[in-house]
Amino acid sequence: MKYIKLLAGLVLATVLFLFPPSAQAASSSSITRSAGEELTAKDYSGQNLVGYEFTNVVLEKTNFSNADFRGGVFNGSQLEGVNMHGVDFSDGIAYLTQFQDADLTDAIFTNAMMLRSVFNHVDITGADFTDAILDGVEIKKLCAKAAGVNSRTGVDTRESLGCR
């Protein structure tokens, strides 16, 4: 009996070695939207973008106003002059992303992870950053200009950032 188990194990190992099962995991390119593209002046306003990913893209003057972008991802992207007024970016990720001259008014960033992202010359009036994770330097910059209350959540922008 001992030899039969050993022989069965050896046969199984040989079969797996000679005929390995194929990998079924998705590659990152199959789940990324618009990787490496330049998306200047595109209009995504009011659209359902739940779970969309933008990786290494230039989004100049792109309109995301009032879009449902929950769980979305910006990774290594440049958002210059974008309109994100009223966007819902709850549970989203913005990593190594540059927000430059962006309209983030009345946007919802609750539970968003926005580490190593930079916010230069942005308007965050009425934006809700409740439980969002941002770098300390960026929080200080945003607190210097934070004002208003989000029209949908009723949360004060300064309070959501933890400004003193």
What are these regions (language model features)?
Residues 2-8, 13-14, 21-164:
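Tandem repeat scaffolds
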